[in-house]
């Protein structure tokens, strides 16, 4: 333990709050919460430590403390900090489960919005729609036709693009009363809570009335809506998301330093989703569980009741901070469901434990083989580079980072080749390595890799070597290239001195390097395709009169990705653009 850390620990507050362990690069590696910060942080260094805690403690270089009023606040703060910083030793949840919701906003005249983010502050969420049988975006577009709520951002009382098309209730000009609007909101709520039967019945009646009046165009419209409902709407699936009560069941199991957690969500006694995480863990087991739940319910609907085996202190803490009743079932139907969850978690752990541990062992073996081969002592931080282009257009390069036995995606970097005169991999590699190491030079070499790996042979190694020599830092950097044979298979390592070392294709090292190549290639190709797509997208947009820089930016901010813009209907595009421009854009995108 260094002097600064010891001094900081001695001054730790004896109050509730969060502690942030940092490594020698000042990176946050673990975040925890405590009722008494002083007691908790000293537990890491006092008394016997198991393997998992020892690994964490060996990397601790400094610590920060954040005091709060009580343990409830500490738990919520911990979840926010973990989501923000994503420390590698915390059990991390994905940013969201990828399932979409349909949101009714809290505005005076609410809008329906298709979103993948759960944020109760914005309004009422219907979903998540996890089933592949339910095409949620099709359902969203259908709802806009069935229930024509406000579909624009107009706040100035002027007619919107949907007004003359009769695709909205004319809320933009305040021609609809709040009472009528409230009726439409209740119809949507009824639709989700009770299914499509009533809507289908109403549409059938409207179709009959229109036919009797010989208004066959209107009758066909009502018939098409019925067909659309029957095509994408599975009543049973919708009912799973419409019940007033939701119950979650959590089970977990530990084997050595691996924890497996399974969370079931039930609505109307039917299982609607299952979330599983299996990973190495650091810290106390109940602390890990409370941290997991606090993170999970930040981005997911909270149940009325959570059934889980938690000690009284943590159950009370979660109840107070999250507002969820927590019950440890001992008999009856819920005990049977808990047994099912335990059976699932046992199966998950048995399936994943060996693969997790064996993966760790294979990585350690591969790194030991590489150390011996290139005669280095330390390989904790690797950077791998690859270039991608098509006939010297849209030239890009990518860097991935493998650190402490895992990919560190926070440190991945994408590079657009700036030198427009540069032609070929030699020049691209020189520029990228020079830019990366020049940045390190400016930062006093705080985050230099132990080894740079290039997806290429002597040609690329020569380019990187020149960049290193030009920056006069050749004594600080280890470098290798991965050379391919005439069958385009990697079979040699090229060293800094351009020596070639053959690889044993049955070794752990060979498969490890192949995995690094696959990851960096995938990352580089993905970036290249996005760059290429953006070039094409920009050229299409430039052909459309009325689409300036500001409107292009609004499109990206609203739809997030080019793919989402391509999939958007004219109605959706019209939420951002004037209707005529939206039509032209849709036509161009369909032709591209």
Swiss-Prot record:
Keywords: Cytoplasm, DNA damage, DNA excision, DNA repair, Excision nuclease, SOS response. It comes from the Bacteria. GO terms for biological process: nucleotide-excision repair; SOS response. Gene3D superfamilies: 5' to 3' exonuclease, C-terminal subdomain, GIY-YIG endonuclease, UvrC, RNAse H endonuclease domain. One of its GO terms (cellular component) is excinuclease repair complex. The keyword Plastid does not apply. It holds the Pfam family UvrC_RNaseH. The keyword Cytoplasm applies. InterPro entries: GIY-YIG_endonuc (IPR000305), GIY-YIG_endonuc_sf (IPR035901), GIY-YIG_UvrC_Cho (IPR047296), RuvA_2-like (IPR010994), UvrABC_protein_C (IPR050066), UvrC (IPR004791), UvrC_RNase_H_dom (IPR001162), UvrC_RNase_H_dom_sf (IPR038476). GO terms for molecular function: DNA binding; excinuclease ABC activity. It is found in: Cytoplasm. Residues 197-232 form the UVR domain. PANTHER family: UVRABC SYSTEM PROTEIN C, UVRC/OXIDOREDUCTASE. Belongs to the UvrC family. NCBIfam families: uvrC. The UvrABC repair system catalyzes the recognition and processing of DNA lesions. UvrC both incises the 5' and 3' sides of the lesion. The N-terminal half is responsible for the 3' incision and the C-terminal half is responsible for the 5' incision. This is UvrABC system protein C. It comes from Mycoplasmoides gallisepticum (strain R(low / passage 15 / clone 2)). The gene is uvrC.
């Amino acid at each position: 333990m260094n002097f600064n850390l010891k001094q900081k620990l001695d001054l730790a507050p004896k109050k509730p709050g969060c502690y942030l362990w940092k490594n020698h690069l000042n990176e946050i590696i673990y975040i925890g919460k405590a009722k008494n910060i002083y007691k908790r942080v000293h537990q890491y260094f006092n008394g016997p430590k198991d393997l998992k805690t020892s690994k964490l403690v060996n990397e601790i270089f400094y610590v920060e403390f954040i005091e709060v009023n009580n343990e409830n606040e500490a738990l919520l703060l911990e979840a926010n900090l973990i989501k923000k910083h994503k420390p590698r030793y915390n059990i991390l949840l994905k940013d969201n489960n990828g399932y979409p919701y349909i949101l009714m906003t809290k505005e005076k005249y609410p809008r329906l919005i298709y979103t993948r983010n759960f944020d109760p502050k914005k309004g009422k969420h219907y979903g998540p729609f996890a089933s592949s049988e339910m095409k949620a975006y099709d359902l969203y577009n259908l709802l806009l036709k069935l229930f024509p709520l406000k579909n624009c951002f107009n706040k100035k009382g002027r007619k919107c693009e949907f007004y003359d098309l009769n695709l909205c209730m004319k809320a933009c000009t305040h021609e609809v009363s709040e009472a009528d609007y409230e009726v439409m909101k209740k119809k949507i709520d009824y639709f989700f809570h009770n299914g499509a039967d009533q809507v289908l019945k109403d549409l059938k009646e409207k179709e009959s009335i229109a036919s009797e009046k010989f208004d066959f165009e209107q009758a066909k419209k009502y018939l098409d809506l019925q067909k659309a409902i029957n095509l994408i709407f599975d009543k049973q699936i919708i009912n799973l998301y419409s019940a007033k009560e939701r119950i979650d069941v959590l089970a977990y199991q530990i084997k050595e330093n691996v924890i497996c957690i399974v969370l079931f969500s039930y609505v109307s006694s039917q299982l609607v989703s299952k979330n599983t995480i299996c990973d190495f863990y650091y810290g106390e087991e109940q602390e890990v569980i409370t941290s997991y739940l606090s993170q999970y319910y930040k981005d997911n609907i909270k149940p009325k009741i959570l059934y889980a085996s938690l000690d009284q202190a943590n159950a009370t803490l979660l109840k107070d901070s999250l507002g969820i009743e927590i019950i440890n079932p001992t008999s009856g139907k819920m005990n049977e469901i808990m047994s099912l969850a335990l059976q699932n978690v046992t199966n998950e752990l048995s399936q994943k434990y060996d693969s997790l541990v064996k993966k760790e062992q294979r990585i350690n073996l591969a790194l030991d083989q590489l150390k011996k081969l290139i005669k280095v002592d330390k390989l904790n931080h690797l950077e791998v580079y690859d270039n991608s282009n098509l006939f010297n257009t849209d030239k890009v390069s990518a860097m991935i980072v493998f650190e402490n036995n895992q990919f560190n995606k926070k440190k991945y970097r994408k590079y657009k080749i700036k030198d427009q005169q540069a032609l070929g991999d030699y020049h691209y590699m020189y520029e990228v390595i020079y830019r990366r190491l020049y940045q390190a030079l400016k930062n006093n070499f705080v985050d230099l890799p132990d080894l740079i790996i290039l997806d290429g042979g002597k040609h690329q190694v020569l380019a990187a070597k020149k960049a290193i020599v030009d920056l006069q830092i050749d004594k600080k950097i280890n470098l290798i290239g991965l050379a391919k044979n005439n069958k385009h298979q990697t079979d040699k390592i090229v060293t800094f001195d351009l020596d070639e070392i053959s690889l044993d294709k049955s070794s752990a090292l060979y498969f490890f390097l192949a995995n690094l190549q696959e990851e960096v290639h995938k990352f580089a190709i993905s970036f290249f395709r996005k760059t290429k797509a953006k070039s094409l997208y920009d050229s299409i947009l430039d052909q459309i009169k009325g689409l300036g820089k500001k409107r292009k930016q609004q499109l990206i901010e609203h739809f997030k990705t080019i793919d989402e813009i391509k999939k958007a209907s004219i109605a959706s595009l019209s939420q951002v653009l004037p209707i005529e421009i939206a039509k032209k854009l849709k036509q161009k995108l369909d032709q591209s």
